[in-house]
């Protein structure tokens, strides 16, 4: 899980979602998981 000021899709399979008011990226590739914060 990467924590970044700005989250971006890193590949085609990345999905941007909002959880508890936080923007997150979920993906099949665990390296692509990101959280804004």
UniProtKB/Swiss-Prot annotation:
The keyword NADP does not apply. SUPFAM superfamilies: Ribosomal protein L36. InterPro entries: Ribosomal_bL36, Ribosomal_bL36_sp. It holds the Pfam family Ribosomal_L36. GO terms for cellular component: cytoplasm; ribonucleoprotein complex; ribosome. Belongs to the bacterial ribosomal protein bL36 family. This is Large ribosomal subunit protein bL36. It comes from Caldanaerobacter subterraneus subsp. tengcongensis (strain DSM 15242 / JCM 11007 / NBRC 100824 / MB4). The lineage of its organism: Bacteria, Bacillati, Bacillota, Clostridia, Thermoanaerobacterales.
